[in-house]
């Protein structure tokens, strides 16, 4: 049975190479893994992502596991230029990596200054910022990160509310709130003020 699956993989790889669905280098790397040394040495994040896509196409769990293992290693050298690509890989595939999370938490201000951060969807922004381990000196810093992200897009009021819930308003002064309201589009201003007072009322009750 195993031999039959391996033969099917070989046929699939040859077919994919012929049809140019995956790059020739990735096809050869997969062949080397499946039929050769069974190791992956590349440190290219893009190549690993393509290999993982190929593993999913072939439904080859062993290849998936090896790609993840290699990506976990590459993640130890994550930096400003590739954090977004690595983050997206783990998030889109339902995976977690503690080193990635630690890097984001410790370098959140640098990360949020990148163009890649501005391109994230609302779920990703919430996932990144809704974490008590983030290293910042003031909660207003997080609020400014959200405001910067909002400057580059228009989201509906539900998504606006969702992303604002990552802010711990109990650490935001009314003066800081006023400054924030002046920075955002008019359609969001009343909603932000309402959220601020609503959260404070909840805290008073508790």
UniProtKB/Swiss-Prot annotation:
Induction info: Expressed in the early phase of the viral replicative cycle.
Keyword Oxidoreductase: no
Residue span(s) of domain BACK: 99-181
Pfam families in the cross-refs: BACK
Top-rank taxon, per record: Viruses
Annotated signal peptide: none
Keyword Iron-sulfur: no
Gene3D superfamilies named in the record: 1.25.40.420
PANTHER family cross-referenced by the UniProt entry: KELCH-LIKE PROTEIN 22 (PTHR45632:SF5), LD33804P (PTHR45632)
Protein name: Protein OPG030
């Amino acid at each position: 049975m195993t031999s039959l699956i391996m033969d099917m993989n070989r046929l699939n790889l040859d077919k994919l190479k012929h049809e140019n669905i995956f790059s020739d280098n990735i096809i050869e790397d997969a062949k080397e893994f499946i039929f050769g040394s069974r190791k992956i040495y590349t440190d290219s994040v893009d190549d690993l992502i393509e290999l993982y896509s190929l593993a999913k196409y072939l439904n080859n769990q062993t290849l998936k596991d090896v790609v993840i293992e290699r990506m976990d290693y590459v993640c130890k050298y994550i930096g400003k230029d590739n954090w977004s690509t690595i983050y997206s890989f783990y998030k889109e595939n339902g995976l977690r990596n503690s080193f990635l999370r630690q890097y984001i938490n410790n370098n959140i201000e640098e990360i949020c200054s990148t163009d890649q951060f501005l391109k994230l969807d609302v779920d990703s922004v919430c996932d990144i910022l809704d974490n008590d381990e983030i290293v910042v000196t003031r909660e207003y810093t997080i609020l400014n990160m959200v405001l910067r992200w909002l400057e580059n897009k228009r989201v509906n009021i539900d998504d606006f509310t969702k992303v604002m819930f990552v802010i711990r308003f109990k650490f935001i002064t009314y003066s800081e709130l006023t400054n924030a309201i002046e920075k955002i589009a008019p359609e969001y201003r009343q909603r932000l003020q309402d959220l601020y007072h609503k959260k404070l009322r909840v805290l008073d009750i508790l």
